[in-house]
């Protein structure tokens, strides 16, 4: 009966996930995820309490959920697709139930605006970041949760067993470390100076991976950063009437994509070192940059029109003339766009990226190879 139940679940999942590869029953029992707005499923909105937030209202959530859920997207985000591929319910955000929740299928610690490095790191550069909930803070929440999930585990055996059955998603993280420098910079903060942050950010991500392995994690997904030179908010902010030579053959900002590539090369090297140091762990390097560039290079293949404009926003060449909120213009069916609100991607784009990570086109090894 167990085999037939599993096969039945796989068939249902294949229908629900459209073109995603079928899931694997029992591959992982839970997912724990860390990161920023790319995978936040409600922590930021919870932190805002009764305050106003555009993420609490439509058109956010309009596609799949038909209402706002705290996801900064028109529908599902990457962690949702990974959970469904492994026959798990959608992973809940940590903060709404952090004191009482049992989280049988895992928890999502990601918070919009989170950085990899703690805010104190940037004070030496006379720079500040707006959110204090960096990667280290999120891992601290995770450790507190583990103590609740495995009380009295003096030797750590219960926690190790729990984590051995779990997938850890470490990001994407680090993107905001660079975003806040680029977006809020001035003459005293030239963009080139951000290159100095790359070694420290990558090393911090690496030490976080090692810390999680020390706790008992055995399967960790480590994504790289997106091609920020193709993001509408960057294009509207940094191109304008600049030299056309600033754009590459895809009409993305050459310097910023080169910068993302430098970060990603350093991260891939760090993941290689971590693999050599931890042969018993499965460390999966996910190429979000490469997967996202497929949408830019071959938009028609995925039913995308112009991949460099936002679906929700205002006027202007990149639809970034106004913020995406309940008064904004939705320029069409989000499934025909790669970008949702000028910064974050659409459910359709995340589905394409997830498929590439699950089947291995943009992951080493494939996420579904568990």
Predicted regions and their residues:
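Conserved active-site regions of diverse hydrolases
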Residues: 2-370
